[in-house]
Structures are given as structure tokens and as C-alpha cells.
Amino acid sequence: MEKLIEKIIYASRWLMFPVYIGLSFGFILLTLKFFQQIILVIPKILIMSESGLILIVLSLIDIALVGGLLVMVMFSGYENFISKMEINVDKKKLGWMGTMDVNSIKNKVASSIVAISSVHLLRLFMDADKISNDKIMWCVIIHLTFVLSAFGMACIDKMSKKNYS
């Protein structure tokens, strides 16, 4: 009975597969949004203010950071929880694939969230004259919370690696 339960639990990891497929579709949608932003800015580029262009570029950077986060979560999650990817090492395999454990994924996700939050905050500061001080204050507080959380997770990871060594 115990062996059967273990086989069922082990096989249930495949239930995550549709989640990773869904993230792939999310990545496609994000890519479409990226190109939509570029297409919309092209006709306006010569009449657009410098700060307006910077806001668009920050938006593109934001989309790129979220896309990178999605790719990292999809690939490393699939490899850690479902199955190893059998990719020809000489040609296509990314250098970090197969080397990230759950803790390093968490730290990279936290770092990505801080970077994304930083871009949002910078975009907010570019339009600070149109935004209430309360909203700016709360955005800064939330950003600092992300920073402290990422720092705390990195410290805990470093301490746990020291204790296992």
C-alpha cells in the first residue's frame, strides 16, 4: 500500500505540467504586449517628449524583466519538479539549466521582483507631479518590503548553506 501511495504522489508532479504550459502562453501574451508598445510608439517618436520616451523604454524594460522571470520559473520549475530537459548541450542548453535548486530559484525570483519594482518606482517618479504623495509613499514602502524580503531570503539561504557545509 505504501509503495502505491508513493507512486501516486510521485506521479502527481505531472499535474504541474499544465501550469508551466499556461506560463508559456502568458509569455506569448507578454511578448505580444512588448511589440504592441513598440508599434504604438513608432508613429509618435518624432513628436514625443524625452520623458515620454523614457517612460515607454521603462515599460519595455519592465516587460523584459517579467519575461525573464517567467522563463526562469518555467525552465527551472519544470526541471526541478517534473523532469530533466534533454537538450543537446553543445547547441541550445542555457548555462544555468540544471544548476538551480529551489532556494536559488527563490532568490532569483526575489531579485527579479525587486528589479521590476524598481522600474515601476522609477516610472512613478518620472510622473511624480501627477501622482499623490500617499501613493508614492505606499509604493516606496512596498518596494522596501520587497528589498528587505529578498535580503532576508538571501541571508537565510547563505546561513543554511553554511550549516550544511
UniProtKB/Swiss-Prot annotation:
One of its GO terms (cellular component) is plasma membrane. InterPro entries: UPF0114, UPF0114_bac. It is found in: Cell membrane. Disulfide bonds: none annotated. It comes from the Bacteria. It is a multi-pass membrane protein. It comes from Buchnera aphidicola subsp. Geoica urticularia. The chain crosses the membrane at residues 10-32, 53-75, 136-155. Belongs to the UPF0114 family. This is UPF0114 protein in repA1-repA2 intergenic region. Keywords: Cell membrane, Membrane, Plasmid, Transmembrane, Transmembrane helix. It holds the Pfam family UPF0114.
